[in-house]
A protein has these predicted regions:
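N-terminal-proximal low-complexity accessory segments that begin disordered
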Residues: 1-46
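Conserved N-proximal alpha/beta basic substrate-recognition cap immediately N-terminal to
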Residues: 28-40, 49-164
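Glycine-rich phosphate-binding loop of ATP-grasp-fold ATP-dependent ligases
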Residues: 152-155, 172-197, 224, 248-264
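A long amphipathic alpha-helix within ATP-dependent nucleotide-binding catalytic cores
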Residues: 208, 237, 250-312, 352-370
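ATP-dependent carboxylate/phosphate-activation module, predominantly the ATP-grasp catalytic core
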Residues: 227-283, 321-346
Length: 371
């Protein structure tokens, strides 16, 4: 049996690096409203931690044709939980950080048996930094992809180096080493920062030790590859994620068979190159993850327009997400060959809502399918 937890504030918790951490309102609301979603990848009879059991059951009811029968529990339920079969019990959060560990231990000290050590959490945090992917993954993927790939990222520890790198790039993307989707990222069309941007970047350097500076590419298409790292360090490729974002914030995913997604992706990327990159990711990260990280993760990529307008280049590592992703959720909702393609979207009005639409009723911008 597993206890599943949707803790979307994970990326911000990594930046804070504290046991006692209060997430921003949006992160807390997302967790409250969508805490039920592990039901879609959990196994029959697993537990899912939520803030409100009745609300989770009601939200789940609207999507009852998808997912498994699970048991929704609250932190109050965990306080009285008796561990009868510790050999088979596991805790599976969206992402591991010091905060979620402390929350579980405050609920029930017996969870200590299933918690990663503080050293392991520190290692996971370091590998979750954008600096890790920029230095240990992206260069090797570029080397393997040769002239068919683009992508570079520089970790800058002073504003002098930030300005030098921006001047070299012309147009840049500045990213906090740790931040959540859409946050901690600035797109800059100029070769030098204005006063506001310089103040923001200097603050990131002060708080996190440095900042990532990357060229701003002419992106044509977003996609990702989803993986799972096993206990022995071996890594399995789980599938392709075709998704849409706006301003760096997640909008939704295409739900389709792997064959259909490959056909869509083939319009913008060399599938043989994508397959080769996938193999290299498994081989490169296996050595880093073995004995440290077990669980789901994903690598976001993008197709970039060539400067001469003739085709596309592959950026093989825009982000390494060392946690479960919305792409993994989309894979859990993959339709059969006989079922129609669908769109999974996350939207916010008075609350966060997850919806699944047939493509004929696509409420997302159609750029999720074609640019």
């Amino acid at each position: 049996m597993k206890l599943h937890i949707f803790n979307p504030e994970h990326d911000i918790a990594l930046a804070a690096n504290q046991e006692r951490f209060t997430a921003p309102h949006a992160g807390r609301r997302l967790r409250t409203d969508l805490g039920f979603i592990p039901a879609f990848w959990a196994s029959e009879g697993d537990m899912v931690l939520v803030d409100d059991v009745e609300a989770a059951i009601e939200a789940r009811r609207h999507l009852s044709k998808f997912g498994k029968d699970v048991v929704f529990v609250t932190y109050a339920d965990l306080k009285a939980f008796a561990f009868e079969d510790v050999e088979s019990f596991q805790v599976d959060p969206w992402g591991w950080d010091r905060t979620i560990k402390e929350q579980l231990l405050r609920a029930n000290s017996d969870f200590q048996l299933f918690m990663p050590s503080d050293d392991t959490l520190a290692a996971i945090r370091e590998m979750s930094s954008r600096r890790f992917a920029a230095e240990h993954l992206l260069p090797l993927l570029r080397e393997a992809g040769e002239e068919k790939t683009v992508g570079e990222a520089r970790y800058c520890t002073t504003m002098e180096v930030v300005k030098q790198t921006m001047a070299q790039n012309g147009k840049s993307v500045l990213k906090s080493p740790w931040s959540s989707s859409g946050r901690g990222v600035r797109y800059v069309e100029t070769a030098a920062p204005d006063a506001h941007l310089e103040g923001w970047a200097a603050n990131v350097v002060k708080r996190q030790g440095g900042i990532m500076v990357e060229p701003l590419y002419n992106k044509v298409y977003d996609f990702g590859l989803e993986f799972f790292c096993n206990a022995d360090g071996t890594i399995d490729f789980k599938g392709i994620s075709l998704f849409a974002t706006r301003g760096g914030a997640y909008l939704g995913n295409i739900l389709a068979t792997e064959a259909d997604k490959r056909e869509m992706l083939s319009r913008y990327a060399d599938l043989a190159l994508v397959d080769s990159v996938s193999e290299h990711i498994c081989n490169i990260l296996s050595a880093h993850f073995k004995g440290v990280y077990e669980g789901a993760f994903g690598v976001d990529m993008m197709a970039v327009a060539r400067e001469d307008g003739d085709g596309f280049m592959l950026h093989p590592c825009v982000e390494l997400n060392l946690r479960r992703t919305m792409g993994h959720l989309a894979l859990a909702l993959t339709p059969t060959i006989a079922e129609p393609q669908r769109i999974m979207s996350i939207s916010y009005a008075d609350k966060y809502r997850m919806r699944i639409h047939d493509t004929a009723k696509n409420l997302l911008n159609t750029s999720i399918v074609t640019p």
